[in-house]
Amino acid sequence: MIFDLIKYNSRTAIIADNGTSLTYAELANRVQDRAQLLQEGVLEFCLCRNDIDSIVHYLACLEAKAPVVLLDAQKDEATIQHLRDIYLPGVTKCHPDLAVCLTTSGTTGSPKLVRLTQRNLLSNAESIVQYLQLDANERPITMLPMYYSFGLSIINSHLLCGATILLTDKTYAQRDFWNFLKENQATSMAGVPYTWEMLKKLRFFRMDLPSVKTMTQAGGKLNADIAREYIQNAKQADRKFIVMYGQTEATARMSYLPWYQAEEKCGSVGVAVPSGRFELVDDQGNVIQESHTDGELIYYGDNVSMGYAECAEDLLKGDENNGRLATGDIAHRDDDGFYYITGRKKRFVKIWGNRCNLDQIEQLVKTLTTPCACIGVDDLVTIFVTIDNIEQDIKQLLITKTGLNSRAFEVRVIDAIPVTESGKIDYATLKSIV
């Protein structure tokens, strides 16, 4: 297995919010006992919560070399059964390099999975330990589900360095979460943009959290103004606010923005993680050498997955990516080698012949109100907000910034912006209500 748990022996590995704690030696024993019940090469399902049993099952699968699909334990039974019918856990034989399968979208309704190896997991965990300078004194609190690649990467990287994981399924909207954080002196917090937007509304900047020394953000682009507020708050509180960028297809992390350059390079996703590298290509596939020129971002590294699976037979496939991932993100590089994501290839629409970046429009609207979300079809962009009497302000801003007529924009007020289980905006649901 990639984690040498016994190496940290009597150190505390996990403190759960039910009061249970395990040393690394105790965790290793539980993992060994569970692993003996599993068959090498035969697919397992792990219905995950942020609890000890889920982590033991996950680690036991790695130990036994039984490939495991990590799924949300709270997902409805019909969806889980649908996936069981497709992938046949307990029966399906898998490729010998396959270790973990994760869903691609933050929802478990789609049968499409990303196929990861132990090498992928280890490479990414080692990179994270290196660039975040993690050690055994860390005490991260779980704010993301472990079936989501970002959440799993936090568990992996901290187990690798002998840290103590504060394990909870409570959310930041619950008082018990904050009590657990304070009582156990959490040293780091992690979230997607929606997390940090909501924490700002909960007056995070006024909270007294002296133990928290690191805050990390990934899973999408955080509004630049909000990012600056967190960067300034971090400086005042002697903390680090670290922006990162990744995809499940790369086992979570591909880049990070060094905390000491966060203010200077605000809006950037930084530089590639230590084990990887980036390049940009144009529409013809030619490598872009110039700075400040948009192209598709390509990532190379040992953390790039083997590919996708959409049926049980796909789990026998070998490595289809060979360490290269076309991210589908449009980006440019500045003169110092820092990368900036400008949008998704699939998040562009044509408005009366003009190419329109929905992600950039969303960021503009966020200067007036958060949360918000934008979707579009040719010749119309629909903006969803949660407050009334702001339609004219939004339209005037977008007319000024884009040069487009007001008829290109529609503003809708809804009760709440739908999000996926991993906290990202659920654009599919928004499209269904248009």
PLM regions and their residue ranges:
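Conserved ATP-binding/catalytic segment of the ANL
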Residues: E296-D359, T367
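Conserved beta-loop-beta connector loops within the AMP-binding
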Residues: R277-Y299, E313, K317, D335-D336, ...
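Conserved C-terminal "lid"/linker of ANL adenylate-forming enzymes
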Residues: V349, T382, L397-V434
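Gly/Ser/Thr-rich phosphate-binding loop
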Residues: A186-G191, K200-E264, R277
